[in-house]
């Protein structure tokens, strides 16, 4: 990162643009991303450090220079240059129209998971007092989105990680969602003997040793939230096989899964005795969420 310009230069035309270009170029080169994408990220870091909006950075060059000279900006830019995901650097990520607190203790919410929420919402009427279980809640993005949009539902969210549960509870408070009970435990451990109208989960589904784990954002995310045994199906087997006794009659199980796993997951649901098994595809036409119903 080049040195900030002197005070006499702060108000010169194009000063803010020069700052943006210099840091954007460095970020694009380090992360092999497009210049427009790098520019957007630099603007986000500057607005956070300077506590100003993006328009002000361009309209008032001195504000851009001031933000750029802060220790907060230098630290966050260095973290991003190392490849750390923006969600962790900024401490937040938008999901389903809501901004969630994010920490390295939780998986970063992804657009594919919004498909899971959409399918769940279709099965929950706005006035329904249905019982819902979110297994492996992580940041709580699924449970909180459902709780926000279906306030009559009664939701239980579980996770093995105390740190993840703390983030999830914080997100529920942030969005004023009060119809979620959070419990610590592995999968159904914390809800022994209970039944639910809907069970949702975005479990780990990456095979241990997958080459993608040492690339991009995955390098920084918690392995326990990503990997599930040598074939990626360890968690899926555990959830699907144990789900039927925890479903009410007519209740549904919805699970997110990886690229190319759709048919195998559908077969798991059928083998567990679930019926009306369907898949929801992403924008590329790839099955990413599979659902089944207890007869």
Describe each model-derived feature in a short phrase:
Residues 205-235:
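Mobile active-site "lid"/loop adjacent to the S-adenosyl-L-methionine
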Residues 230-293:
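Conserved Class I SAM-dependent methyltransferase catalytic core
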Residues 1-57, 65:
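Non-catalytic accessory regions of SAM-dependent methyltransferases
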Residues 45, 172, 202, 217, ...:
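Conserved RecA-like P-loop NTPase ATPase core
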Residues 111-212, 218, 260:
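Conserved SAM/SAH cofactor-binding pocket of Class I
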Residues 99, 154, 179-181, 275-278:
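Conserved beta-strand segments of alpha/beta enzyme cores
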Residues 2, 44-122:
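Conserved AdoMet
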